[in-house]
């Protein structure tokens, strides 16, 4: 018995929105200066978007108060991190603010193979390494509304010393200049609006013809 047109449309929508064995996941990269709010935005995006996972980076830095291993980051010693680098275990890794950060290639591949779309929240230099490796990805740069607001946010979160804040602001000047390397730009002027913009990007990327090819061809066959 053939399915009704409504059922066929529902199947196509499911392929777009949800993970599954018929579809390999999409890889997204979100980068931003420290303090721009990228982690908060992506965490809310994942909460609101089915089939989307946030990759947890590995880092050699000590956990801050309130941070949980395996939830905020995978915290490892510098020696362990360097051994993972030597073993080729990272899709990308970077040195930032005196600490090492990296994305485990096997963890990411496992999620993508299972049909999950994956978001990497990584630095500009890490994003460059992923692109240089020829990995297909959609990239988003999150910008603060202004330098003054970024400085206000960094000081307001009370996580860093004065020298560290000044260091992060200096790095931010170089990072924002890299926005043109990304496919999309989202200005985080208001959290809810910025999350909506990110979600629109995910929805649009899922609907690209190349990614809907199988579902579209299946629908076309119902017209035969």
List the predicted regions and their residue ranges.
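Conserved lysine of the Walker
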Residues: 38
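A glycine- and Lys/Arg-enriched "phosphate-lid" helix/loop adjacent to the NTP-binding pocket
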Residues: 61-66, 89, 112-117, 124, ...
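P-loop (Walker A) phosphate-binding loop of NTP-binding proteins
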Residues: 31-33
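C-terminal accessory "lid"/substrate-recognition subdomains
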Residues: 2-4, 200-224
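Extreme N-terminal, non-catalytic leader segments
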Residues: 1-27
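ATP-dependent small-molecule kinase phosphotransfer cores
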Residues: 57-120, 124-128
């Amino acid at each position: 018995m053939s399915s009704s047109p409504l059922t066929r449309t529902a199947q196509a929508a499911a392929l777009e929105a949800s993970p599954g064995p018929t579809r390999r996941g999409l890889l997204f990269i979100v980068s931003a200066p420290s303090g721009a709010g990228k982690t908060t935005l992506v965490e809310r995006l994942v909460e609101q978007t089915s089939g989307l996972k946030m990759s947890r980076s590995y880092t050699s830095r000590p956990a801050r108060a309130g941070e949980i291993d395996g939830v905020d980051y995978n915290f490892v010693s510098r020696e362990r991190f360097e051994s993972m680098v030597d073993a080729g275990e990272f899709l990308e890794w970077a040195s930032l603010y005196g600490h090492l950060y990296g994305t485990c290639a096997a963890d990411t591949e496992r999620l993508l193979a299972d049909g999950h779309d994956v978001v990497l929240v990584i630095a500009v230099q890490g994003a460059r390494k992923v692109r240089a490796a020829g990995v297909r990805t959609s990239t988003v740069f999150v910008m603060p509304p202004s330098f003054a607001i970024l400085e206000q946010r960094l000081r307001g979160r009370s996580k860093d010393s004065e020298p560290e804040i000044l260091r992060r602001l200096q790095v931010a000047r170089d990072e924002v200049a890299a926005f043109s390397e990304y496919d999309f730009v989202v200005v985080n002027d208001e959290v809810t609006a910025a999350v909506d913009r990110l979600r629109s990007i995910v929805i649009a990327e899922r609907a690209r013809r190349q990614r809907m090819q199988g579902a579209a061809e299946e629908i076309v066959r119902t017209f035969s």
